[in-house]
Amino acid sequence: MARAGPEYREWNSELIKPKKLLNPVKASRSHQELHRELLMNHKRGLGMDRKPELQRVLEHRRRNQLIKKKEEELEAKRMQCPFEQELLRRQQRLNQLENPPQREEDHAPEFIKVRENLRRITTLTSEERAL
């Protein structure tokens, strides 16, 4: 098996000499500029682990929106007049009175509730007998 190397050119001058094919991607101007920019960033120490510019801009915008929203909420609380604050307090008090906190019995297991109901039934039947 003959090795195709530079020596084949020397002994046969009638052969067509191959030309190196151009890579269309590397030949494009934009690819060369991109490659040049990547090399410069690498030399300056800007790593590839950094986020893309679009992602950084979107995160920055989201962060600014959250900060703005929180500031608006705080400003709205500060701007409440004393009358509105008192109305809010009264509304909360009325809600507490209308919806009293559930008794501890409501959180008791089912068998305890049934047992208490049975006691009431037995006491009611004994009272009915007494009548």
Curated annotation (Swiss-Prot):
Cellular component terms per the entry's GO annotation: actin cytoskeleton; cytoplasm; focal adhesion; glutamatergic synapse; neuron projection; nucleus; postsynaptic actin cytoskeleton; presynaptic actin cytoskeleton
Record motif Nuclear localization signal, residues: 61-71
Main location as per UniProt: nucleus
Disulfide bonds: none
A Pfam family reported for this protein in Swiss-Prot or TrEMBL: DUF1151
InterPro entries, per database record: FAM107
Keywords on record: Actin-binding, Cell cycle, Cell junction, Cell membrane, Cell projection, Coiled coil, Cytoplasm, Cytoskeleton, Growth regulation, Membrane, Nucleus, Stress response, Synapse
Molecular function per GO: actin binding
Coiled coil: 57-77
Task of the protein: Stress-inducible actin-binding protein that plays a role in synaptic and cognitive functions by modulating actin filamentous (F-actin) dynamics. Mediates polymerization of globular actin to F-actin. Also binds to, stabilizes and bundles F-actin. Involved in synaptic function by regulating neurite outgrowth in an actin-dependent manner and for the acquisition of hippocampus-dependent cognitive function, such as learning and long-term memory.
Listed name of the protein: Actin-associated protein FAM107A
Native source species: Rattus norvegicus (Rat)
Gene: Fam107a
